[in-house]
Curated annotation (Swiss-Prot):
Listed name of the protein: Pentatricopeptide repeat-containing protein At1g73400, mitochondrial
Protein's cellular compartments: Mitochondrion
Range of the transit peptide: 1-55
InterPro entries documented for this protein: Pentatricopeptide_rpt, TPR-like_helical_dom_sf
Amino acid sequence: MMRRLVSYFVRSRFSLHLSTTPPQRSALFSHILSSHLDSIQINKKISSFSVHRFCSTTLLNPELEITRIEKVSEDQSLVYCNENDIRTKGSNHAVGILHEAIMANLNAYDDMEKALDESSVDLTTPVVCKILQRLQYEEKTAFRFFTWAGHQEHYSHEPIAYNEMIDILSSTKYKNKQFRIVIDMLDYMKRNNKTVVLVDVLLEILRKYCERYLTHVQKFAKRKRIRVKTQPEINAFNMLLDALCKCGLVKEGEALLRRMRHRVKPDANTFNVLFFGWCRVRDPKKAMKLLEEMIEAGHKPENFTYCAAIDTFCQAGMVDEAADLFDFMITKGSAVSAPTAKTFALMIVALAKNDKAEECFELIGRMISTGCLPDVSTYKDVIEGMCMAEKVDEAYKFLDEMSNKGYPPDIVTYNCFLRVLCENRKTDEALKLYGRMVESRCAPSVQTYNMLISMFFEMDDPDGAFNTWTEMDKRDCVQDVETYCAMINGLFDCHRAKEACFLLEEVVNKGLKLPYRVFDSFLMRLSEVGNLKAIHKVSEHMKKFYNHSMARRFALSEKRKSTKLRGK
């Protein structure tokens, strides 16, 4: 029984209820019934009518009766309402309410169960099946709803609901192998007429699952001729915990660990899975508690564990919690988990985004004092993070601070900074940064000029692009293929085809190899302006690099298109 998967593991029992008793109708049906009765217009000339029961006695009010018209006038049309109409409309209304609550709380940290409880919708098997059908491509969300529905009063899953859930878990594009464990347990119960699965049987199922599907460990051990010290079932157990955590059922996953840890010894990966689960649902207190328990158990968290958690908290805006975890990492962490420049970069960006400039620069000094030397990736992460948060002034201060401490930025750092400014079309800031590069005697590279040229064309400023081209000649920076491509594309976009054809001819004369996609786009542009001579010349040039027959056929095709366009 899948709806009690978690409680089975927690209580070491697996109860299967296949009750076929129809659920009670909700008060919603009565409301819809009243609306239907009010909408029926009865002709005053009705001569006679007979009384019939509306439906079976399973309605809330079995004494309710409805008049059934025997005779009406010829010019009157009568609207009938029956039990199927009421059931369908009521079911659709309930499905709409539940689906809206689910869609509004899709994230793992959202309390979907609370939102569903507040919807106050009485569950029926058709309603549950319709919700599962709508969530057939979101197996994690579907399983989360299925688990919630199974714990509601006055409702129990019927076989059709189990079939829907099993089909979703086994037919999605992710092919989650974890749920094959559930299939094995259901098969065991069916074949042995059991309502309880023993712990020993569960361990045997996990062991067989590991041997059948997690074969990479055994293959590695056989190839290297080593003995695997870990229990084979712990790998399958960790995968099951991971599935629960990804579905937002972290509390149930931790309860499962508490019940099973005396039979299956947890490893570091077990704690990491639950730790990431608490971070995913944004519960730092329980995450820190589990981390302390992990250390007490003799497992040393790796640096990746801390970095992933800090990054998760920072993205969620929980900077104080991330700072507490960072301090815990320094004070109680081991040498293996000591903070690196990447960890400092995450915290620096988070503090800058939350307008904590003083703490940000204090952390920079702390990074230098601990011996974490900044590298290119550190500059890149910090500058990109600050610029994306529109903290350009703080990014400049960061460069000044690092320069004062003896770590001046290089051309790669400046280019990372410049790329963010150019992508956000901040022309003044980009030119200011370029002037700063020149003043600091950091020679701009060809990538620097390429970004400036692309930015000017995006800002519809071809003169600025030509000035950048001239600046390259003054500083003896040779243009590469990307420079020519940026200039030619920009000139075509600005409807300056003559200058674009001139540069394209220069590409041919220099013997530069154009990327085939760019070559294809240039031929299309030349075809639009009707320059057949340039088409043939570029095609002949590209024969040196690409398939001759393909280039010839493409050129002839473009020639015919150009001739046809000119004829119109």
